[in-house]
Amino acid sequence: MIRPLLTTDLDAAVELWYQASVQAHDFIPATFWREQQAAMRDIYLPASKSWVYEEDGQLLGFISWYQGSVAALFISPDHQSHGLGRQLLEHLKAQYDRLELTVYAENEQARRFYSRNGFKEGEQQLCEHSGRPELVMHWQRG
């Protein structure tokens, strides 16, 4: 079931974000993600509109929107490749006519996922937090 993120979900969402980030970004040290956990819980998630995918009381994934962008889309490593990310992305696409996001250039799996879901790769830039190259991807209804 997809539902809005509640403040009571924050700890579980941050733990899921950490586990999925370490798994998906093996080109960035795990310490980087660990150092970002407090900001994710206290700044980024509260500032965003977020929805979770919950099953049997367990948070399996979440998506966050902030100022026209998909700010986060993370699925528990144990539940990836079962369509949960696509469902969360479709939930967001149903509410907006256009979206953009950034994805690390080295994250081939995420780039393929977003391309399969209608996003087009655009400009390349450096991530302000990690200094790694990332791509801006765009989606527009129509």
What do these predicted ranges mean?
Residues L10, E15-M40:
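Conserved GNAT-fold acetyl-CoA-binding loop/helix
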Residues R41-V52, S69, P133:
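A short helix-loop-beta-strand connector motif used in the catalytic cores of GNAT acetyltransferases and
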Residues Y66, V70-Q80, Y104:
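A short, internal acetyl-CoA/4′-phosphopantetheine-binding micro-motif in the GNAT/acyltransferase core
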Residues H79, G83-H91:
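Conserved acetyl-CoA pyrophosphate-binding loop and the N-cap/start of the following alpha-helix
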Residues A94-E106:
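Conserved GNAT acetyl-CoA-binding A-motif
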Residues T102-Y104, K120-V136:
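Conserved catalytic-core motifs of GNAT/GCN5-like acyltransferases
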